Swiss-Prot record:
Region (Disordered): 1-59, 585-614, 727-772, 894-945, 1256-1289
Family: Belongs to the protein kinase superfamily. CAMK Ser/Thr protein kinase family. SNF1 subfamily.
UniProt keywords, alphabetically: ATP-binding, Cytoplasm, Disease variant, Dwarfism, Kinase, Magnesium, Metal-binding, Methylation, Nucleotide-binding, Phosphoprotein, Serine/threonine-protein kinase, Transferase
InterPro entries named among the record's database cross-references: Kinase-like_dom_sf (IPR011009), Prot_kinase_dom (IPR000719), Protein_kinase_ATP_BS (IPR017441), Ser/Thr_kinase_AS (IPR008271), SIK (IPR034672), UBA (IPR015940)
Gene: SIK3
EC number, UniProt record: 2.7.11.1
Reported effect, residue 1161 to V: In a breast cancer sample; somatic mutation
Principal subcellular localisation of the protein: cytoplasm
Description of post-translational modifications: Phosphorylated at Thr-221 by STK11/LKB1 in complex with STE20-related adapter-alpha (STRADA) pseudo kinase and CAB39. Phosphorylation at Thr-221 is inhibited in response to PTHLH/PTHrP. Phosphorylated at Thr-469 and Ser-551 in response to cAMP signaling.
Highest taxon listed in the record's lineage: Eukaryota
Protein name (record): Serine/threonine-protein kinase SIK3
Disease cited in the entry: Spondyloepimetaphyseal dysplasia, Krakow type: An autosomal recessive skeletal disorder characterized by severe spondyloepimetaphyseal dysplasia, rhizomelia, mesomelia with significant anterior bowing of all limbs, severe immunodeficiency, and developmental delay.
Protein's GO biological process: intracellular signal transduction; microtubule cytoskeleton organization; positive regulation of TORC1 signaling; positive regulation of TORC2 signaling; protein phosphorylation
Biased composition (Low complexity): 36-47, 896-909
Amino acid sequence: MAAAAASGAGGAAGAGTGGAGPAGRLLPPPAPGSPAAPAAVSPAAGQPRPPAPASRGPMPARIGYYEIDRTIGKGNFAVVKRATHLVTKAKVAIKIIDKTQLDEENLKKIFREVQIMKMLCHPHIIRLYQVMETERMIYLVTEYASGGEIFDHLVAHGRMAEKEARRKFKQIVTAVYFCHCRNIVHRDLKAENLLLDANLNIKIADFGFSNLFTPGQLLKTWCGSPPYAAPELFEGKEYDGPKVDIWSLGVVLYVLVCGALPFDGSTLQNLRARVLSGKFRIPFFMSTECEHLIRHMLVLDPNKRLSMEQICKHKWMKLGDADPNFDRLIAECQQLKEERQVDPLNEDVLLAMEDMGLDKEQTLQSLRSDAYDHYSAIYSLLCDRHKRHKTLRLGALPSMPRALAFQAPVNIQAEQAGTAMNISVPQVQLINPENQIVEPDGTLNLDSDEGEEPSPEALVRYLSMRRHTVGVADPRTEVMEDLQKLLPGFPGVNPQAPFLQVAPNVNFMHNLLPMQNLQPTGQLEYKEQSLLQPPTLQLLNGMGPLGRRASDGGANIQLHAQQLLKRPRGPSPLVTMTPAVPAVTPVDEESSDGEPDQEAVQSSTYKDSNTLHLPTERFSPVRRFSDGAASIQAFKAHLEKMGNNSSIKQLQQECEQLQKMYGGQIDERTLEKTQQQHMLYQQEQHHQILQQQIQDSICPPQPSPPLQAACENQPALLTHQLQRLRIQPSSPPPNHPNNHLFRQPSNSPPPMSSAMIQPHGAASSSQFQGLPSRSAIFQQQPENCSSPPNVALTCLGMQQPAQSQQVTIQVQEPVDMLSNMPGTAAGSSGRGISISPSAGQMQMQHRTNLMATLSYGHRPLSKQLSADSAEAHSLNVNRFSPANYDQAHLHPHLFSDQSRGSPSSYSPSTGVGFSPTQALKVPPLDQFPTFPPSAHQQPPHYTTSALQQALLSPTPPDYTRHQQVPHILQGLLSPRHSLTGHSDIRLPPTEFAQLIKRQQQQRQQQQQQQQQQEYQELFRHMNQGDAGSLAPSLGGQSMTERQALSYQNADSYHHHTSPQHLLQIRAQECVSQASSPTPPHGYAHQPALMHSESMEEDCSCEGAKDGFQDSKSSSTLTKGCHDSPLLLSTGGPGDPESLLGTVSHAQELGIHPYGHQPTAAFSKNKVPSREPVIGNCMDRSSPGQAVELPDHNGLGYPARPSVHEHHRPRALQRHHTIQNSDDAYVQLDNLPGMSLVAGKALSSARMSDAVLSQSSLMGSQQFQDGENEECGASLGGHEHPDLSDGSQHLNSSCYPSTCITDILLSYKHPEVSFSMEQAGV
């Protein structure tokens, strides 16, 4: 039908053109004696007739008073041009309809549309300005909406916010309500027919399906767009017109808010089923009020749908700011009477028109009779301008088009019954009286009105996103370039002129030339002026280049079905017709139809999920919201075309060609040569693969999980303990090396680097980048001087120069170790062994060293080894110098290569004084850069184990308690105590693998011979209670002697003259401050180690029973709890006593056997252990003041609150031997600062400890009762006697936290029946 077919151009016209309605809008055919819509009005008396100016070259074409700019839309039977009114300079849209393409019924609908548009004068409805008609053509001049369709706006910008959608929807409602009050039903409301002006106000266009209705009477014509059509239309029932519009309004609102259709389907039947079901999805972002409104508009029963009055009063419509314009328009609609309310005439506009030379009486008559001629058009345009600009700046009236009375067929019929003149033109030529080409006068300002158009940027944006529903231009509507070149004597045509300029100016009133004289040749005569006949592409496609619009021809389902039946069955014309496109002359910068090129819109158009891709050059990839199914026949044809020219056939042809090329007989020589090359290539590939495998095993190019081979080849080191924690080959590490454990930030402490090795009171020297290492500063100290405190601060360790020295673990009995120290007192036990590289001496020192650690430790060997093993093994051994860490972490067996002289000559960089041959090598420690290069020239390799990775997440540098923890205290937070998952700086796995490989080659023969003997010696002494016998001798040792114990080497070496000099922590930094302002050595504030690791046995109150004889001497940094108030606790800032511990607390906590100095716990020579700090950090928090320990995400979580104001007894929860995996997980409940992976890893270590303690440690569980009792006694402030006997039980407090941890990881004892996975890691 014409209305439907032309509606495509109408929508485009509206969108780009101001919405000139769907099809041509014009008056019914003028009956004799009745006024008709004048095309070109005959010259009226008094009308100015200025002479035509001389020819000045090609100028834009004119239609009446309108100068054509460009084509902005095409439909099946209509073309829409944008034009500029010559008088008012207003932009208009002119829809040109070919009547010859319309049947009788559709022509009547177009007349009805024009009649209805004349009745509608609303700010949100496209205005009809003028109607011109010839014998073949109908010209509808309508308002131009420069903002385009809301459909395009949604495609370009996505769905609207409800506030914006509410504003648009209110304008739509006022316009539809106005129509209903006029008894007009639109019946084709959809996003494509909602246009936007320059100010983004709504303009409803396309009244091609509109009709008049009588309230209470039902309509029965099926029309509209299927996705927007009400269910009663799909059912074929008679329907209430306004209720159909209300359903469509509900769909429109859904589209505005959601950017999608509520009902859509790939075929019309699917769409019909969905609409009839009435079910649609409500997105999560839609408000409840909006959902309520939509649901009550999209009701299947028309009688239950909301009315327009109810919609206007709905809660959602009332939201937001007040809208006086909406209220006013609704009030006007309600006050409308049946007769049309005529606005009073604007006298200013009438005077302006009279000044222009237009007869006032003629204008008044035109307005009263609704002639919609150029008089009424000028009046309406001037009224619109006056409303917008409050001014009427008009130029001189151009030469008025004259009615042309052609000699033969053309006649002018002036109907006296009305003022309008109807000009009958039997054949519309390219140049006709109404379309004469007139050059504008030089006095006219051709610039358009300001405000009429959006900014150029907006226009470019609009043009770039606009897509039209029509296809290529009809060749019959455009003049091709070759024809233009054939015209003799005329310059090139301006491409912007849609009509060829044949004569510079033809004034038909002066010379009524015959038609053949107007044109040099007859080539330009179109025998049929079928401007509106759609190209074959469109007729066959039925969809246009964008797929069928909702209301394009196919919107009438019967007509659409007929078109489908008439389509050819052959190859699709979608491809075959494209070669005709280049023949069309582009008439402007954007081609004749104004479409942007395909690539310009794809970026924004692909966001539509309902995209139908067809193989046509000009096909837009975005379907309209209202597009139905793609043409099945066209798709079939497309498939046939694909079958004919498919890529499969091309591949087959290529295959045949290859067979022809290479399928023949090949020369034997060539074949043999090819075969040899192939074999060489295979060998080379195989060699490369082998090389890669070898490289991966030695030096993996990228971080990878620890190599199992390295672990398997690694000889068992010191004890069963090391091997019991050995991860089974089937257990992958809990974290891939690419995880945070192997990242290397510049300021995060590595899990096993300087922050790890240092004592809790010390910090990595790397924080002071400009300061020399402590080894360089204090290396030459006198023997009797205690080492100055470590100058390093928090463990933000910078990378230390990598000196890959093989570090061997020296296990000495305590007396041997002390005697080997330069400052060892003469009273030390005779068990000391002279420092010599012999293996036997190394074994003895190994045992004595281990026994020393056992005797001064505070927990069972199993737990101690678990913690230390994980700690040592996860060291980034080749990056962080032990010189940066307090040596309280460095037991002699850990760093045998470090000469451990007396504290006076203490230098972490120097070896402890044991040659490498004296100690068993521990792979992870072999890489510490500060070990003397002489120790080992071949840097060993070691791959970190899963347990290490899990345990050793570094402490975050910005660790804080309730308030900020001082940087000094952060030094106490070694990575294993703050398993927060922070990244750390480590040696890459590649270097680890290399070091391991070299180390294994050196150690295999030497250590395999020593393993069994060491195991036997170690456990024989352990079982015999060697550690217990060491305690009495230690009582007589000087502080210098005991300082040599690496696990006691805290960097806070203070000449404490009073208990207050123990460790200074500034209260303003949220840690309670001891009374002494600064340590004697100016020891920097070291962060208290908030001990979040369950492996650390924190009950420092048990320290006294570990062989400490003197209850009066206290060393707050050793496991033996000291009298000095240095035991750091997690108490709040207001709890200095609970945080730092007082003398009474230290007395409660235990007796230290280091000499008999009550207050000189940190004398010069004293190298206290870090363990009490650990214990108190976690256990001595004041009640209700849980310390916030940040996890790896930066989220604080509280540390364990203390049960007691002072130190909390740990009871069995922390000290009993775990018997099974369940116990291990129970233990994890009390690890506030531990990450889950680390906790599970610890549980694995504890489960290994269970077997260990049962088989090797003589009833550690049995000793726990006494141990706990003693712990309670120490809490009570009682001094403990010598507990050397108890130390033989090796209970949970028998070992310092820095015991040989790395010994634990390389062996899995046969008794351990679970892997790391089973243990929960």
